[in-house]
């Protein structure tokens, strides 16, 4: 039986807001069942630090009694409104409480929404002991350049 754990609570917001500019109930902007609703989303508003973290709790699912087919799926895009830093990388980690279970860094975000995923190894999936305490952490990492490069 296929199960889907979807965002159902905010754990920490960092400097992230939703499409309306609010940092309240961010999970509601990324909890779509179809995954293709790009009209609501979350975005980091922090351009002064090297990284910004948001974490959401996931809905409870039962232990599948198998370590196969544990897949984290998300939809994302990147932008560089300043024109100086390039498109940031996005690290997504699956956590059980404060313990990291699996993580993947995406350094190739596109400027249009696209689907991304990573599959847990058997050992990562077997490390999950409480399927009612799963979370997703999103860390946006910006590379700062002190001066833009200009040809002379």
Predicted segments, located by residue:
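Noncatalytic modules at the cell exterior or secretory-pathway interfaces
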Residues: 125-139
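Short, surface-exposed beta-strand/strand-loop-strand elements in extracellular ectodomains
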Residues: 83-97
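Extracellular carbohydrate recognition and processing domains
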Residues: 100-126
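A short beta-strand element within beta-rich, extracytoplasmic domains
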Residues: 57-81, 136
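Disordered, acidic Ser/Thr/Pro-rich linker "stalks" and the adjacent N-terminal cap
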Residues: 4-48
């Amino acid at each position: 039986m296929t199960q889907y754990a979807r965002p159902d609570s905010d754990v920490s917001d960092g400097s992230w807001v939703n499409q309306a500019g609010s940092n309240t109930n961010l999970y509601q902007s990324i909890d779509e069942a179809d995954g293709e609703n790009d009209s609501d989303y979350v975005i980091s508003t922090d351009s002064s630090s090297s990284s910004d973290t948001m974490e959401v709790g996931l809905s409870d699912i039962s232990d599948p009694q198998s370590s196969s087919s544990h897949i984290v799926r998300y939809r994302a895009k990147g932008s560089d409104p300043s024109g100086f830093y390039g498109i940031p990388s996005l690290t997504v980690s699956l956590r059980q409480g404060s313990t990291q279970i699996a993580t993947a860094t995406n350094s190739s975000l596109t400027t249009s929404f696209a689907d991304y995923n990573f599959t847990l190894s058997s050992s990562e999936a077997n490390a999950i002991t409480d399927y009612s305490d799963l979370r997703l952490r999103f860390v946006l990492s910006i590379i700062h350049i002190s001066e833009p490069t200009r040809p002379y």
